Amino acid sequence: TTGTNRLDSYTYDELLAFNLVDDFRAETNFKIPKFTDVLVWAKKNNAVLTIDIKRSVDVSEIIKVIKKYDAQDISIIITYDVDQTEKAYKLAPNLLMSVSARNEEELNRLLQTSIPVENMLAFTGTRLSDSKLYEDLHKLGIKTILGTLGNLDRQAAAKNDSLYMIWHNKGIDIIATDRPFQAASALKIVK
């Protein structure tokens, strides 16, 4: 945004004085939307949202809003630990969840819960994991997510974006990237 300081130091009305900036840091005419506005837009445009529920936010409040706007079918919630994931599942057993499964230990903790694997997308971190983890996740029917934001995106850019296909072939199903167009092109994804 064109604002400074922490977001939580402003009221929403004060935030409306700021504009969003684009990827090149150029000011746009767009204001900060409310979560409810984003849900309405996503439903209307058939867009899938990954909703990042930070630890300081009560997952029940977010799920209440998702349900109120009948947006369960376009919402994937990002959870950070087993407790948060279990709470989310109890509140909304039909929601798809991005769960932390960066190693076998985290995966085993998730498997010991009552959450069906059909509700899970496994976030495997921002570094490549051992191939065995991806194999184990796929055997369970769980899709994998690799966060290439930052370091891995820079590595891909330096290698003519060929790394995106290498990572996909290693077992990555979803790439969370700051370079979506380059990744899609490298993966030969066309609209």
Where are the regions that the model predicts?
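Metal-dependent phosphodiesterase/phospholipase catalytic core, i.e.
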Residues: 1-105, 117-118, 124, 138-140, ...
